Amino acid sequence: MVSKQQTMGFQTEVKQMLHLVVHSLYSNKEIFLRELISNASDALDKLRFLALSNGSLFENDSDLKISIQINEKLQTITISDNGIGLSWEEAVENLGTIAKSGTKEFISQLTGEQAKDSQLIGQFGVGFYSAFIVADKVTVKSRRAGLQPEDGIVWESKGDGEFTIGYEKKSTRGTEITLHLKPENDEFLSDWRIRGIISKYSDHICWPIVMKKLSEEGKESKEFETVNKATALWTLQKSEISEEDYKQLYKHISHDYMDPLTWSHNHVEGKHEYITLLYIPAHAPFDLWQHEAKHGLKLYVKRVFIMDEATQFLPRYLRFVKGIVDASDLPLNISREILQDNKQVESIRAACTKRVLSMLEKMATNDKETYQKFWNEFGLVLKEGPIEDFANKEAIAKLLRFSTTASGSEKQEVSLEEYISRMKEGQDKIYYITASSYNAAKNSPHLEIFRKKGIEVLLLSDKVDEWLVGYMNEFAGKKLQSISKGKIELGDDETSEQIKEQEKTLEPLIKHIKSVLNERVKDVLLTNRLTDSPACVVADEQDMGLEMQRILQAAGQQVPVSKPIFEINPDHALIKRLHDIQDDNQFELWVTMLFEQAVLAEGGQLDNPADFVNRVNRLLVSS
C-alpha cells in the first residue's frame, strides 16, 4: 500500500538527458542492463564498506548479490540488489536531478557513434536513465539499510517529464528496479539473451549475479544460479586473465568506451602485500582540466571495496591513470585523512608512480605510434611532472615530446634524447624558445642566427612550458637555455670580435637610442642573434621571461617590474638609416617604431596600439 504519494517534475536537465539517452542510443539498447548492474554493484560495495563499522546494516543478511528476474506474462525485467538502498531524499536527489554541468558536457561529447555514445552515459553518472531506452515505465522500490520497513519507498516514471514517489513497506533493504518493456523490446524477455548480455558486459563484476536455473527443456525452476564469474579479477594471476577480461574490467571501473592503451598488473609481496592494476586510457576525460574533477584509483582492502577516487596513490600529474589498489595490510576502517600520513600508502604511491612511468617508457620505446597517441591526449598533463615530482624528474623528462625547428610541424614528437643526438659538434646546450603560440615561436626573430647555423631549437608554446623549463634546467648533463633571455654564446669568436668593434663605432648611436627609449628598456645592445630583422627585445638573464610575465599578467597576478633589453642588428638597412637622421623628432619616431615592432614580433602587447599605427603612418608618408 503506497502512502503519502507525491508527483514531482524532473529537473530540466534530466528531461534533456532522458531525451538524449533514449534517442541517441536506441540502436544499442542492451547497454541498459550493463548500467543497472553496475549501479547495483556500487550499492553492494557501499553497504559492505559501511557495515565494517556498523554490522547491524546487514540486517542478518550478509549474502550480497544481484538478482535478475524476467516475467514474460507482465513483460517486465526486474534487477534487484540487497545493497545500501535509497531513502526518500536520496531517491528524489539521485533519480530526479543531475548536475547542470553534466548535461552540458554530455551533449558536447556526443559523437553520433552508438558504441561511443553508449559509454558516455556511465561516464556522466546517468546510467539509470538508460532504462527508458527499452521501457515505457520504470518502477523503483527501495529501502536504505538501517531504516524501518515503513520507510521503504516506491518511485515510478514513464520518462515523460515527471515521476511519482511515495512510501511503501519493504521488509528487505536494497533496491528493486522493474522495467515495463516497450512491445518492440520483447527480445529482452529471453533468458538466453539476458545471460549473453551479462557475459558480454558484466562477467567481471565481483558480486554474484543470479538468475533462475533453466531445466533441460528451457523452463525456469525455483532455484537460482550464478551467471557471472563473480571474481575479483585483479586477485588472479596474469596467466589466468584474458586480454578481453582486462579490457572489460577497465571499461567497468572507468566508464570509458574505448579499450585502454596498456596496463600493468602486479602482485607485490614482502614487507607490504598489495595488488595494483593500472591502466593508461586511450583518450582524455572531459573533465581532465577541471580542478574539482574526481580522479584517483579504486581502493580495496583484502578485496573489500573502501573508496573510489583515492588520490593518495598517484601524483596529480598522473591523474589520468585508472585502476585498482588492493592492500592487505591497511585497516578496513581507513579514512581519506588516515591515508594522508600512512607510510605504507607512501610506499605504494612511489611504486605506482614508477610503474606508470615504466609503462610509458616501454610504450615510447617499443611502440612509438601508440605513444604519440598517448602524448596527443595527455602530454600537457605529463609536462606538470617535473614541476611536481623532483624524484622522478629525469624519468619524466625522457617521456616529454616537443615541436622543434627541425620537425617543421606543430606536432610535438621530438624527445630530448633525439634532440641531443642531432646536436651540432661543440654544442653543449639545449636551446628553446617560449611563446604564446606555435606560430609566434616558429616566426620569432630570435631564431634567425640558429637557422643560419643549422642549430635545432625547441618551440615551446604550451602555457605550462614556462614553468616546466623553470624546474627542468638540464637534461643528460646538457643545460636548457632560452634563446630570448640573456646573452647567446654560439662559440663564434669572429662574430664576437666584430660586435666589439661595432660597439665602439656605434656608441653614440646606442646612447641616442637609450635616451629616446629611456625608462622603457633596461639596456640597448648590439645583437648576435639577428640576421634578417632590425631589432628584437630580450629578457635579462636573471629576469622573468617575457612570456611568463604575460601569462601571470593575464591571470591577474602581480608581476615584478622588469624591463626588456633592446637589441639592434647593426647590419640591417633600417639601423644603418638611423645614422643619417639628423632631425631628433624623426629619429625618435623611428626608434620608437622599431622598439614597438620588436615587442609585437615577440608576441607582446602595446600600451597604446593607436599611437603605434599613427607613428607608422607618419613614417610611411615621410619616406
Swiss-Prot record:
CDD domains named among the record's database cross-references: HATPase_Hsp90-like
Major location category of this protein: cytoplasm
Record key words, sorted: ATP-binding, Chaperone, Cytoplasm, Nucleotide-binding, Stress response
Subcellular locations according to the entry: Cytoplasm
Domain of life: Bacteria
Cytoplasm keyword on record: yes
Residue ranges of the region described as B: 337-550
Cellular component terms per the entry's GO annotation: cytoplasm
SUPFAM superfamilies for this protein: ATPase domain of HSP90 chaperone/DNA topoisomerase II/histidine kinase, HSP90 C-terminal domain, Ribosomal protein S5 domain 2-like
Span list, region A: 1-336
Chain positions covered by the region annotation C: 551-623
GO MF annotation list: ATP binding; ATP hydrolysis activity; ATP-dependent protein folding chaperone; unfolded protein binding
Summary of the function given for this chain in its UniProt record: Molecular chaperone. Has ATPase activity.
Family: Belongs to the heat shock protein 90 family.
PANTHER family: HEAT SHOCK PROTEIN 90 FAMILY MEMBER (PTHR11528)
UniProt subunit comment: Homodimer.
Protein name, per record: Chaperone protein HtpG
Organism, as annotated: Legionella pneumophila (strain Corby)
Phylogenetic placement of the source organism: Bacteria, Pseudomonadati, Pseudomonadota, Gammaproteobacteria, Legionellales
Gene coding for it: htpG
